[in-house]
């Protein structure tokens, strides 16, 4: 009886080994409770030369201050927390307490965006604020998206880009304190404002975020 038991155990081990090989060849990961949690690296924000002094926000290519982003896969949206890199805050790590999981090595398609309002199932349309004279309203007019990107198992990177356009105005030959700057003649498509009061970033420079368009003029 002992010899029979040994032979049966060996046969079971052989079958398990064959099953593991078949699973690996098919591209599936070793079995776990749900798989391996997906952790993303967020990149793509451009630290423009016109970055606003004193601000730390996506508008200036910086993830510092961003708490979370929306991440959509297969029609489902989950919240991922943002941890900016201490060495390079233009990149960040995205993790979640309720993550998506890798169940195999196949590529996945992901859309992500910021800012995110609970209940959104797709990235919102670009809609900027009419009065961006306050820093929070300038920064709050931004929209960054990683749209329908292919993410690989070995390099789960999301490259975000700005959906807004940035207009910067530098004043010369004027008396300080007497200037009033206003962007006018803007497209109102998507319920965007026809006029925008820009943010005074100092050094005779004003900046604003607008929906992508040709700027007709300002005063």
Listing of model-derived features with the role each one plays in the protein:
Residues 2-11, 18-219:
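Sec-type signal peptide cleavage vicinity
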